[in-house]
């Protein structure tokens, strides 16, 4: 997971929703499908084949990729299971677990008349956004990201 995986918090803004949607997200990718086969067996989800079209500087085609996305219902269990083995993404996993715990503790009712959920409170939006930004900083790549990550 440290090299080929993703642990993050996604945000989606829809025009017809009164507040943004946040969700915990975990997954893994590899050029070998066999490496990923254990994940759907224990956590659900599917492995997707990505036909790679890019080439390197010598004109060689990049290897095709396989991606597995952890279902929302299994993300907490998955992160708890892999946490002892993580080296580089420990802080991200802990922040996402905190996000899941807070999200599950937040009592959210139904919207009247239009269906869907009631809007998030400003305090809840700020809490979720704070965690999302912390995870994004830790996941940043490049020379400016070193201060925010573990490795």
Outline where the language-model segments fall.
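Internal intein/HINT superfamily modules and their associated LAGLIDADG
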Residues: 1-151
């Amino acid at each position: 997971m440290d090299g080929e995986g993703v642990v993050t918090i996604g945000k989606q803004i829809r025009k017809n929703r009164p507040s943004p949607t946040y969700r915990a997200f975990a997954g893994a990718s590899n050029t070998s499908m066999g490496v990923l086969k254990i994940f759907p067996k224990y956590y659900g989800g599917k492995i997707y084949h990505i036909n790679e079209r890019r080439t390197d500087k010598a004109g060689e085609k990049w290897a095709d990729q396989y991606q597995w996305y952890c279902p929302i219902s299994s993300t907490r269990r998955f992160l708890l299971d892999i946490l002892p083995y993580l080296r580089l993404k420990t802080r991200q996993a802990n922040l996402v677990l905190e996000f899941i715990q807070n999200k599950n503790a937040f009592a959210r009712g139904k919207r009247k008349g239009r269906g869907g959920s009631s809007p998030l409170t400003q305090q809840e939006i700020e809490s979720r956004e704070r965690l999302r930004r912390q995870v994004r900083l830790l996941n940043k790549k490049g020379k400016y990201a070193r201060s925010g990550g573990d490795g």
